[in-house]
Amino acid sequence: MDIKKILAEVKRGCAELIDEERIENLIKNYYEKGENFFIKAGFDPTAPDLHLGHSVVLTKMAFLQKHGAIVQFLIGDFTGQIGDPSGKSATRKKLDKEQVLINAKTYKTQVFKVLDKEKTQIKFNSTWLNELGAAGIVELTSTFSVARMLERDDFTKRFKEQSPISICEFLYPLLQGYDSVALKSDIEMGGTDQKFNLLMGRQLQRVYNIGKEQAVIMMPLLEGLDGVNKMSKSLNNYIGVTEKANDMYAKILSISDELMFRYYELLSQKSLEEIAQIKKDIEQGNLHPKKAKENLALEITERFHSKEEANNAKSEFDRIHSQNALPSDMAEFEIQGKIWLAKALVECGLESSTSAARRSISANAVSVNSQKVSDEQMYLEQGEYILQIGKRKFAKLKVKE
């Protein structure tokens, strides 16, 4: 087995590796001695759905599962009630325990769309953090100083601006680091925004003398559909892993050619050599960028659905956009009495709020019965309407008298 080649794939797309030699030795020991190793990634269930941004880390872990890794998929049901302060300019609202548990349940069903179930352990950090107790918390907090905490850019900025920083937020990185002590992880993965917390795990493993120090693999934050901001549900630039095949396929096709290669690098399971060949073929005019994007959309859609559903999504997309046809699975709604268009867009699930709907109207992105609409105050009287936003969102609305 070519360990160097495997390590090159591990490093692919990574923002930073800490203790690369340890990662190499873990893989080598698996092939030479049959010893598995443990790779941890924590996810606070603060929202009900995972998106492709989350799957960047999952995809890398899935690759490592083929080379000896047992994934410790850690659901932060305890820390999720605090909220990770990383990159935040204000104290996060404390989440309700019931909502955290509901979100955690959906994570358990979604994660196996990427990871090998037989090589994955689902863990909840309440298991050990609930047992830590006051004495354990005091011992944990004694391992780190306030001065070190204030080295974090986000805390420093808030401190200088005299914005509140709760003691809970100081506790968060300590608790995340303690997770690595409890799990005895060999590697921890996370985004670049998690560096402080990930290094905390290494330090606490040393302090608690568990006989190992985890290596760290940091992945870049995946840009959303806009190609500028990180993928986020709040920015509405995301692709959810549970989205319908048609929507997933269409959204991937909407990204720019430049962003396409970023997605290939971080989300595709094609080898580095295969991706290099795709780039070369495009540069030499042997492959159209649109075809390369279609192939990427098919690959990702198939991973989260099935080959048949991915192919059907492609056929449906081609039918709609080449023939100016309407989606065959367009949702239908009925409303009693005339309705403000912005509200109708929300009622039909095409927008999340009337404010967002008005922005779409002012951006000339909304059509009613194939006619562009620019009047934000437009009302729909009795009749039947085809509502459309952009190229992907459609709904049929019947307004009754």
UniProtKB/Swiss-Prot annotation:
Class of enzymatic activity (EC top level):
ligase
Task: State where the protein is found.
Answer: Cytoplasm
Respond yes or no to whether keyword 4Fe-4S is given for this record. no
Spell out the GO cellular component terms annotated for this protein, sorted alphabetically and separated by semicolons: cytosol
Q: What is its main location?
A: cytoplasm
Q: Which InterPro entries match?
A: aa-tRNA-synth_I_CS, aa-tRNA-synth_Ic, Rossmann-like_a/b/a_fold, S4_RNA-bd, S4_RNA-bd_sf, SYY-like_C, Tyr-tRNA-ligase, Tyr-tRNA-ligase_bac-type
Question: Keywords assigned by UniProt?
Answer: Aminoacyl-tRNA synthetase, ATP-binding, Cytoplasm, Ligase, Nucleotide-binding, Protein biosynthesis, RNA-binding
Q: Which GO terms describe its biological process?
A: tyrosyl-tRNA aminoacylation
- Family per UniProt? Belongs to the class-I aminoacyl-tRNA synthetase family. TyrS type 2 subfamily.
HAMAP family found in the cross-reference section:
Tyr_tRNA_synth_type2
Spell out the protein name for this chain: Tyrosine--tRNA ligase
Q: Which organism is it from?
A: Campylobacter jejuni subsp. jejuni serotype O:2 (strain ATCC 700819 / NCTC 11168)
Q: Which gene encodes it?
A: tyrS
